[in-house]
Structures are given as structure tokens and as C-alpha cells.
């Protein structure tokens, strides 16, 4: 896996926390010092936490499960969409619809509605509608795409959540906890880390900070997928060997029976 260096984190500004007066005391173990009224995050601990999170994420992906990324703040939207779509994971960057996890069956219905509209556009049904009906459906499709487009392929609840800024995404975190879904999160010095399963202490306001962490996480996802492919290949090879041995044994036993009868 890609191991982020101290220098990379420093250059990306990962160490910059919030003003001392805005801090959450629960983040004290991850604070190195205070400089000019601003808390400085201990990057050695950040590296350890990135490694821990990366290892856990790789195992989740290796087992064939999905991780849902949530980042609706301006500084994180684009970088998360770019990085996460590249590795084929679902993400929410526009708006967290309440009940997206706790009321997942309803969300699935909305996704299915998108699928129906897309099918109408492809099979010609759309052309049979009036101009007004087409406009209404097009607007409806655009709204669904904005809110749910990136999770359209999510057939079941995700196995984990990765969150940028636990304060802003508190509803998503709350829903995940209610369903016992593990939460990975970039947590700044003004946030409460309690209840977060995998804490990555870091600046969650700078795009450069978010990006350098996502690079490591996405690399772990790629490795997890590669190892899953290898596991599948080995399993298929073992199955073929087992079938081959079984067939040979069956032939030998068949010959033995014929010999004993003759």
C-alpha cells in the first residue's frame, strides 16, 4: 500500500487544526502543540491512523464489499468525486438525503425510478410523451441524479462509511452508527471523534489535505480489488484441479469395477 510520508502531509497542510478556542477536548491525544492560537496536529499519529484505516479498507474491498464516501463540503466535493469514482466506489457529494441508510428500501425505489426513466429514453417510450411530460420527467431525473446518481449501483447497504468532516456529516454518521456500519473519518481538532471507528486526525478544510489522505485510501482500495481478483483466480484454479482429480478418480474406479467383473 501507498505509505504517506511526514513530508507529504506537512506540505499538504494536514497538520493545521482549528483555533484553540474552537477545539474539542476529545481530540487532545492527536494535538502536538499550539502555535499562534492554532492547534497543530501530530502528523506521526496521522500516519499511523492512515495506515490503520488503509489496512482495514483493503480487507473490506478484498471481501467484495462496498464503502460509501460522504463529503458535501465545498473543499472536498470535487476531489472526492474524482478519486472515488476512479476506484469504483459510491459517493455522496451534493446532499445527504435523510434516511439514505436507515430508510434504504425507499432510496432503492428512487434509484429504480431513475432506471425506469433511463429505460424509457432508450426504448422510445419517452418520445411518445407530450412535451410537458418529457420536461417534468427530465427535471425529475436531473434531481434524482444530483442527489443519488453516484449510488445508483449500490444494491445493498454499504459495509462502511468514509466521511470528510464528521461535524458537517453528522446525520450520515448517526445513521451509520444506528445500523452498526463502521465509520472511517477525517477528523479535525474542532470535531468529536467519539463513536468514529477509524479516526484520521487531519485538516478537513484544505483540499490538499483531503487529497493526500484520499490518495492513500484509494490506493488501498485498488490493492484490495487486485487481491480479490487473485483470490478468485486461485479459487477457480483450485476448483478446476479438484474437478480434474475427481474425474480421474472416477475413471480409475470405473476401470477397477470393470476389471473385477471380467
From Swiss-Prot:
The keyword Ribonucleoprotein appears for this protein: yes
GO molecular function: structural constituent of ribosome
Domain of life: Bacteria
Pfam families, A to Z: Ribosomal_S2
Protein name as annotated: Small ribosomal subunit protein uS2
Signal peptide range: none
SUPFAM superfamilies: Ribosomal protein S2
One cellular component term from this protein's GO annotations in UniProt: cytosolic small ribosomal subunit
A biological-process GO annotation: translation
Family note: Belongs to the universal ribosomal protein uS2 family.
Organism placement in taxonomy: Bacteria, Pseudomonadati, Bacteroidota, Bacteroidia, Bacteroidales
Keywords associated with the record: Ribonucleoprotein, Ribosomal protein
Organism (species): Azobacteroides pseudotrichonymphae genomovar. CFP2
Amino acid at each position: 500500500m501507498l505509505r504517506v510520508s511526514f513530508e507529504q502531509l506537512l506540505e499538504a497542510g494536514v497538520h493545521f487544526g482549528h483555533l484553540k478556542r474552537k477545539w474539542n477536548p476529545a481530540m487532545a491525544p492527536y494535538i502536538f502543540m499550539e502555535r499562534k492560537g492554532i492547534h497543530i496536529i501530530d502528523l506521526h499519529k496521522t500516519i499511523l491512523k492512515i495506515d490503520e484505516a488503509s489496512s482495514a479498507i483493503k480487507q473490506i474491498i478484498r471481501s467484495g464489499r462496498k464503502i460509501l464516501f460522504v463529503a458535501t463540503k465545498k473543499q472536498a466535493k470535487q476531489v472526492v468525486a474524482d478519486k472515488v469514482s476512479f476506484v469504483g466506489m459510491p459517493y455522496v457529494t451534493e446532499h445527504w438525503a435523510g434516511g439514505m441508510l436507515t430508510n434504504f428500501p425507499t432510496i432503492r425505489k428512487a434509484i429504480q425510478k431513475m432506471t425506469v426513466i433511463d429505460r424509457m429514453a432508450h426504448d422510445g417510450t419517452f418520445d411518445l410523451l407530450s412535451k410537458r411530460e418529457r420536461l417534468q420527467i427530465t427535471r425529475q431525473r436531473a434531481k434524482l441524479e444530483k442527489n443519488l446518481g453516484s449510488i445508483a449501483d449500490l444494491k445493498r447497504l454499504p459495509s462502511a462509511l468514509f466521511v470528510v468532516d464528521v461535524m458537517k456529516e453528522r446525520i450520515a454518521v448517526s445513521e451509520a452508527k444506528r445500523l452498526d456500519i463502521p465509520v472511517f473519518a477525517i477528523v479535525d481538532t474542532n470535531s468529536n471523534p467519539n463513536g468514529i471507528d477509524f479516526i484520521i486526525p487531519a485538516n478537513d478544510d484544505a483540499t490538499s489535505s483531503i487529497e493526500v489522505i484520499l490518495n492513500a485510501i484509494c490506493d488501498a482500495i485498488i490493492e484490495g480489488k487486485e487481491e480479490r481478483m487473485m483470490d478468485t483466480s486461485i479459487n477457480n484454479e483450485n476448483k478446476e484441479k479438484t474437478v480434474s482429480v475427481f474425474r480421474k478418480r472416477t475413471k480409475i474406479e470405473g476401470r477397477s469395477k470393470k476389471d473385477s467383473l471380467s
